Amino acid sequence: MASPIIQPAGAGIHDIFTQLELWESIDKGLSMITILRDNDVLWKPFLQLTLFNQLNIVRKAWSATIQKASESDKVPTLKDVYTSESSFIAQALLDTKNLQITPPATPRTALSGALLAKTIVIFHHSERAQEELGTELPEEVRSLVNQNAICLKVLYNANQWHIDLHYKRDSLSSAQAGEVAEIFEQYLEEALEAVASAIPPSPPVEDDNAGHGGLCKERTDCPKVNRCIHDLIEEQAIARPDQEGICAYDGSLSYAGLSKLSSVLAEQLKTFGARPEQRVAILMNKSFWYPVVVLAVLKSGAAFVPLDPSHPKNRLKQLISEIEPCALITTSVLSELADDLGCPSLAIDSDLTRSKEGSTTALLPNTSASPNNAAYIIFTSGSTGKPKGVVVEHSALSTSAITRGVVLGLGPDSRVLQYAPHTFDVSVDEILTTLIHGGCVCVPSEDDRFSIAHFMESARVTVALLTPTSARTLHPDEVPSLRILQTGGEVLTEDVNDKWSNRVTLFNVYGPTEASVACVISNRTGLKGAGHVLGQAVGGKLWIVDPDDIERHLPDNEVGELVISGAILARGYFRDPSRTESSFVRMRNGERVYRTGDLASMDSAGTIIYHGRKDLEVKIRGQRINIAEIEIAILQCDLVHSVVVEYPRSGLFEKKLVAVLRFEDSSSDAEDGLFGGAKGLTEDIYCLLLSHVSSVLTPAMIPSKWLSLPCVPQMPSGKADRKQVRGWLEDMDKRTYTRIFHPNGTDNLISDPSDSMVAIWLKVLKLEPQSLRLDQSFIRNGGDSIMAMEARHQAHEAGINIDVRELLGSRALQEIGEMATKTSAVEEVSKIEDDRDEPFPLSPVQQMYFDKVSDPSLGLQQRVCVEIMTKIQPDMLREALNHVIQKHRMLAARFTKHMGQWMQQVPFGKNLKHLSRCHIYSQAVGSLGDFCSEPMALEDGTLLHAHLQSSGERQTLVLCVHHLVVDFVSWRVILQDLHDALAAAQNGLPSGISRSTLTFQQWCREQTKYASTLIPEAVLPFAPGPVNLRFWQPSNVQAVSNTYSEIVQHDFRLSSTQTTQMLEKFTTATVHPTDLMLATFALAFKRIFTERDTPTIFIEGHGREPWHASLDVSQTVGWFTAAFPIHLPKDTLLNTTTAILGASERRRSVLANGHPYWACRYLSPNGQKVFGDDPRHQEMEFVFNYAGSIVQRAPGQTLFAENVRIAEIGHPNCERFSLFDIGAAIEMPSSELVVSFTFPKGIAHRERVAELVKTYQELLETAVERDLDLSAKLSSPLVCPADVVRSLEVNGVCIERDVEIVYTPSSIQQHMLWRQSQEPWFYRVQGDWTIEKTTTQSEPVDIDRLSHAWNQVVHRHTTLRTVFRYSSEEERFVAIVLHEVKPAISIIRKGIQTSGSLCRDDDLSPPHRMVLREKDNGSVVCELEFSHTIIDAASRSIVVQDLLDAYDGKLAHRPLDFPPFWEYIRLAQSSTPSARKEELHRAGRVVTLPFQPTHVLSKVPEACKKNEITISSFFMTAWSIVLAKHFVAHNQRVDSTSSQAVAFDYVLSDRSANIPGIESAVGPYIRLPTLETHVKEGVSLKNIARGLHAQCTFQSLSQSTQDGSSLELPSKATALQKYSTLVNIRNSGSDSLDLVSDSGEWKWILQGFSDPWDYDLVFAVNVHAGKVTGWTVEYADGVVEHSAADEIAKDLNDVVERMVCEII
């Protein structure tokens, strides 16, 4: 084919591009659609934006197009795949698993999700377009482009943009392509119109780049947005009046409410004289009122000036005196402080019309501001000692807010955190920029700011601007709603960048207050490293100049001063023309620039890099602070002669303000050198200075460290030599630091640096133990508010509660620590008893040992070999070992059989003192295996043996201990304590014994108690696979010998490089190297042994997971090891990625690394019963243990060589625990992963096992070296049992395409599903409503419209799109949430007896149905039926109300502001339930005995109020009395001295869980707790009721969702009486009894309702609007006799009447 004709250089951009694309289209089978071809007017304002903003608009419009066209709920991500000098290519990737199942109704324009999953966007810069035509793209890029059916091609230059959409004709029809193009044009046009409305027409700006070198590489500055801030916000209020504008801890406001309140207040402010260029001060704490006040001041025409109530009163008075405001707006809480400031004030409370001056609020003449009037004044620190007020005009902030909002993607769906103090300019951005873009401002309380994660989650914050220091205290998992994080105010450090860059869209922002908050932005998403790169200009122009000559622009990459120009610049400093003139400079060409004082450089692309400051200004936690202002304040003290304040960047004073003083009475002679005379301040002088500076400086400006010098070093000019002082501070060593601040040494109050609170102080304050003063406050020790937040977080992790406000007060750390301990004590487990001189139970792994080993004395030993670096004597070693044994008495334990059960005992007192606890050998041994090869006597022998072997100057120590008393972790403790004892002996010091953690005896005792509380069904989320030991038995052998003398071993290793890659790639929040090794082993096994399923693997762990934070066994010696089974079915092993994800999902779902399972299996009677006879839990085919690094020596153990060898050796005749042992460890010092397979040599398939090991190695190495894309799927909860996957596929359901989520239902749901599988009438909720017209003029009910409305409701709620399947392989039900379902709806029209569309019970129908019947009178009967597995009583009201709204056309406009049900399960379920097949007895049909209402019903609420009990407690009391009468145990008489114990379950709503929006969610949010109480004859009914009410209240609070026990199986309380009974107080869902549509034309009337529960007797009470409407007694026919049930119902009626009469 002929080549295209290339036009000459003068050809227009459109002609060149058209010819190029025409040729490509013919050649490649493409067709083309031009976007917005003839609309120059619309493009013109767009061309005034920066290139950064232009590209962002196009990219966002294309992302929105893909999302809408594919009907996805996910926004596509654009990933750059190619970049050259003048073009780049991006690929839009869409997560297709959320696309709908069924196609749209019009197949002609239907778009397949696969076609839109990957699309290409190509950008060309037109000035290089001809050169690009002959440029070959890399092969992989061309291949990637050709794989996409749709390509958007963009050609641009400074004066013109041209966009074409290309599509493959064999993949898309012209109609389909046209639909995509139409959607894209719509979004692009809306964006261009928004730009046009924000940027009014302006004359073209001359291109002055030629004269300004580095001046703005791509664009002139952004045109001025000549609008008032409040006008832009009012436009949003008109556009979205009902949308939430303010969401605060103390209230919320819609945009309409915000507009109305601010307008009323603005009129009041005018009576105070508010008008343009006048000032209004605001003195308020955080509140929803503050944004109202800010907007009101702007509407009044004045400028607002925020003041901080926490600042010193003298400073506030100084500011008030300077700005002379016409009014001061405050709150009643701060009114006393406001009165002292001497300014007319207005207190804002709920009544806006109340004024202290008694002024009227009549509407006054309009005094609105213009865009050039002042909008606000922010005061920053000043070098003269006087704060300087930055005056910012409306147009400056409007320009900045609009341009930055476009870059950040702010919009109506943005919920922005208002975190910064009001006196920071960032708060202006958080409030006004958010409102300008139609978002919601989320305002925490002052206390919330110290634990901000909780507020961010509850307020559903999506955008935040934090300093890197503040961002460091948060974790991405704590704020799942956060989508955009901006960091600014400080240099973005590497750790903060790496923590967030892959979890949110991360921006680094820069800008002084003088440039309207921010003017440089860098997108750090996905990038690593520190953020010294500030980014590119947004909203203005920036360039680099010579600090001594700003007219000289510096070349690219040269460091100079950063200057800013453009419409975003502030007016200047308030009433300070000299400082304004020096900072805001007019250049020779007339351009006005601001000199930032920041040193920076700019590269050829316009990217700015920060290099520090040229003056004395520093940023502390985002606040600009001028050092000179602090120094001036300190010099006002008479006793200070001179001062230098520094902010060191490294060393012991890193990022702390340090004041270096010379006092008036000090000698200037430096006898000990320049800094030799440095001293700390006495307490009196420190308090005097602190009192003074606290009265004039803000808290952030007060130095945290103070010291004095005989003289301050000076330069020849006479000025202080700051560089020398700073260098001395940064280089100061610990010895000098201690001499200055702790000269007496004895003042140090630390007795134990390992104390948990002390450890927190040391870590957070970054101090050495000798530098921490517990007798001083947190602030006095160098702390600040950010450190206080970090300390609170660290304490919380340690199970300790501390109050941030106390930390920031004057209390000493010692006192705070004592208070914290007392506060936390109520949350700890009951006091743990001390060790006793008596036998105590075994740990689970010890019990397993005695169960499996026929001769326990043969058993296992662990041996450690370490080289001694400094020679020791045997006697010294003996004493050191005796010291270790005295500290860890388990090393001298004895094992005895007591009544057939093995127990253990440790020696006490004299027994310990005189016991020969260890044997020391000195003769040579051949090898480590030869030493101590004889069995150890468990009952009366020695369990610790040591061998000290000398060879010349070298000594080697070998320690051998019976495995029953140690594990791998124990050796780290033993070696450390042994080293310390030897070191103390060499130095002639005594060896102290301290026990900071539990003893092994205490752990075993508490563990046995804990195990008794565990439920076997809840400790293991996935059932093990079938065990198949016979597979390994040779046909000619009766049994395979599995002892340590009959084993063989195969090993392989990964190189150090591969090992490093493994640790880096597979050590994340969700993936562990264990997952990789398990997954690749399973894949290898599947490949080699094709004839059988993959085996269950028991994962071995250290077993030291505490169930409460107060249990610390980190320094305890004993055998703790635990294990749990995991099975990766071969059908789920599709590839390496899915195998790793499956292993990760199953491993992480097991609570506490399997410790609860292990404890339950061996220590719990129920666990022994459930697991004891199940071979899957008893016979271990494979055991896997990843030990990590096996080096045991700590860095400080200088007596020992670095390399420590450790081995586990079994006696030749000892039985092994499993058939195959797979061990993995990182060997040091080579840093290589070593994997070993150990198995009996007599097994079958030995050759294939060798193949297995080889294949395993290959797969493991390949996985390590490949770049597996795990990130996109780690959050995908679509791991589904293989048999369920197969059943879904039979029904045409694809997991990845059609399923939203797969999760394990709660234990309550599992129980309901089991019961329904046997007797389907249980837990089937039915309600019948009549829907009728309210007037004769009303339109008849449209039955088809009602059916369509129900479809909308079903689509809205995930529980209504949930189907349940049973997995036979894993013996549990699973819940599958489908993207699309077709609900079961039956329509029976007038005169027709059969349904138009039959209700179905097919495999893909959720468990609910609707039947609609038309009546002759125009009404409709609606029958709704649900399984209780998907709704509760409150859900019924929600669903019916949604149906009404959908019928009225209002549902589609309501936000989805409620959580899916599985979020509740994850919070409430202590572990994923494993519901075994329940043995349920047939119960028969449910019979209902209705109660006939009497006058007594109306009196129940009054009786309850009078006695301060709830209606629920009233009726539960009545039920208790009836149960006590009917079910008294045989031979038990109830009299005045005895009481009858009764128990019953009751239905408790669990919508108090701390999950935002749960009150609007649909699902079974219920618990079924058991209430056990005593009914005593002779006690009044009133006292019984009050006691039961208190018991219920305590129980509901103590069994909160947070304790993980919320969703356990119902107990049915059958232990105390014959029948299982339930009390169901139906006070939720009553809103669905009678409903009227908003239009008032028709109403719903409940005709009947049934709700059968699987209990022998159910007492159900209906409560509506606080009134009792009736009750019923329901019983299971065939279990309860009718006569007995009837008698119970009659007695219940009598008891209720008697209770009302007695307690009213």
Curated annotation (Swiss-Prot):
Highest rank taxon of the organism: Eukaryota
Matches recorded under InterPro entries: AA_adenyl_dom (IPR010071), ACP-like_sf (IPR036736), AMP-bd_C_sf (IPR045851), AMP-binding_CS (IPR020845), AMP-dep_synth/lig_dom (IPR000873), ANL_N_sf (IPR042099), CAT-like_dom_sf (IPR023213), Condensatn (IPR001242)
Top-level class of the enzyme under EC nomenclature: isomerase
Signal peptide residues on this chain, from the entry's feature table: none
Keyword RNA-binding recorded: no
Effect recorded for H1428A: Compromises the catalytic activity, but does not affect substrate binding at the A domain
Annotated CDD domains: A_NRPS_SidN3_like (cd05918)
Assigned GO CC terms: cytoplasm; fungal-type cell wall
Domain called Carrier: residue spans: 748-827
Pathway(s) this gene product operates in, as recorded in its UniProt entry: Pigment biosynthesis
Catalyzed reactions per annotation: L-tryptophan + ATP + H2O = D-tryptophan + AMP + diphosphate + H(+)
Mutant lacking the gene: phenotype: Impairs the production of the gray-brown conidiophore pigment and leads to 'ivory' (colorless) conidiophores.
Residue numbers carrying O-(pantetheine 4'-phosphoryl)serine: S785
EC number from the UniProt entry: 5.1.-.-
Region (Epimerization (E) domain) residue spans: 840-1266
Any one GO molecular-function label of the UniProt entry: phosphopantetheine binding
Swiss-Prot/TrEMBL GO biological process terms: amino acid activation for nonribosomal peptide biosynthetic process; conidium formation; pigment biosynthetic process; positive regulation of conidium formation; secondary metabolic process; secondary metabolite biosynthetic process
Positions of transmembrane segments: none
Function: Nonribosomal peptide synthetase; part of the pathway that mediates the biosynthesis of the gray-brown conidiophore pigment. The first step of the pathway is performed by the nonribosomal peptide synthetase ivoA that catalyzes ATP-dependent unidirectional stereoinversion of L-tryptophan to D-tryptophan with complete conversion. While the stereoinversion is catalyzed by the epimerization (E) domain of ivoA, the terminal condensation (C) domain stereoselectively hydrolyzes D-tryptophanyl-S-phosphopantetheine thioester and thus represents a non-canonical C domain function.
Domain notes from UniProt: NRP synthetases are composed of discrete domains (adenylation (A), thiolation (T) or peptidyl carrier protein (PCP) and condensation (C) domains) which when grouped together are referred to as a single module. Each module is responsible for the recognition (via the A domain) and incorporation of a single amino acid into the growing peptide product. Thus, an NRP synthetase is generally composed of one or more modules and can terminate in a thioesterase domain (TE) that releases the newly synthesized peptide from the enzyme.
Family: Belongs to the NRP synthetase family.
Protein name: Nonribosomal peptide synthetase ivoA
Organism whose genome encodes this protein: Emericella nidulans (strain FGSC A4 / ATCC 38163 / CBS 112.46 / NRRL 194 / M139)
Name of encoding gene: ivoA
